[in-house]
């Protein structure tokens, strides 16, 4: 009798231990889901959306959002800009010549120096290439100026956005030049910056709105031609823009495309951190830099 009780006690203890071990060693469905989610998050931890400038079918540089590994953004951006890179959208192209190597680079107090191999000289459109490299790297907040060396020899020095992009020269008098960059869209809905050099003594924001209401070859603007900039003011790093009702569409909404066209253009011309959009003096939307 005692032997039977002892055996029964051992059996119950063993069974209990087996059940406990089973619970702790076999994950539940919920635990599997949590683990999988954590792995997915870990996989994209080093990626962030950045903008670079690639070439469209009309040979214009376009602003292109792309995921870039944050471990070495400068090197990765240069790789994306190189011809025959298969990681960019099929409708776009790079422009740094094939086989060009970034030999080294260094960043000192927001001044970036790039040292390329001699293949960089093989570019068929050096102005486009230099604008594209400059604008792409200046999208990084820790870079303000760029110099480009080829085999350790300085070639392009102190580059910034003042060099312009997709430049259009529309002036007749060199002595009264105004330079302003306008952002349009192309047929694939990529934003296309065009730096215009003109004889126009209006304030830059007025030129931006006037140009966005007019047509441009191979480019699109969604700003209604009846839109009027009633008034504007800059205050505490904010640019207030007050429009008439034609800023809005028939549904009383301001489309994202219209907002971005204006905002990108303003941020290239004004050192402000925010744009406040108003319609007939009523605040409707704001955009941060």
Residue map of PLM features:
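Bimodal "functional hotspot" detector
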Residues: 1-289
């Amino acid at each position: 009798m005692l032997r039977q009780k002892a055996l029964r006690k051992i059996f119950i203890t063993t069974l209990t231990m087996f059940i406990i071990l089973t619970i702790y060693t076999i994950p539940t469905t919920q635990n599997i889901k949590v683990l999988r989610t954590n792995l997915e998050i870990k996989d994209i931890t080093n990626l962030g959306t950045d903008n670079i400038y690639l070439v469209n079918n009309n040979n214009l540089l376009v602003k292109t959002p792309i995921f870039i590994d944050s471990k070495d953004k400068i090197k990765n951006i240069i790789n994306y800009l190189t011809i025959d890179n298969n990681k960019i959208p099929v409708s776009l192209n790079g422009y740094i010549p094939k086989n060009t190597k970034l030999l080294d680079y260094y960043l000192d107090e927001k001044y970036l120096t790039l040292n390329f191999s001699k293949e960089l000289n093989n570019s068929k459109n050096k102005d486009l290439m230099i604008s594209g490299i400059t604008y792409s790297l200046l999208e990084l907040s820790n870079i303000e100026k760029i110099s480009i060396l080829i085999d350790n020899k300085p070639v392009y020095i102190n580059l910034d956005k003042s060099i312009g992009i997709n430049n259009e020269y529309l002036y007749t008098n060199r002595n009264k030049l105004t330079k302003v960059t306008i952002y349009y869209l192309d047929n694939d809905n990529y934003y296309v910056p065009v730096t215009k050099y003109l004889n126009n003594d209006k304030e830059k924001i007025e030129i931006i709105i006037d140009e966005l209401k007019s047509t441009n070859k191979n480019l699109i603007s969604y700003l209604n031609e009846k839109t009027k900039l009633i008034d504007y003011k800059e205050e505490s790093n904010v640019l207030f823009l007050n429009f008439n009702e034609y800023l809005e569409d028939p549904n009383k909404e301001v489309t994202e495309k219209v907002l971005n066209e204006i905002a990108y253009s303003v941020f290239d011309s004004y050192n402000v951190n925010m744009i406040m959009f108003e319609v007939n003096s009523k605040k409707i939307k704001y955009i941060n830099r």
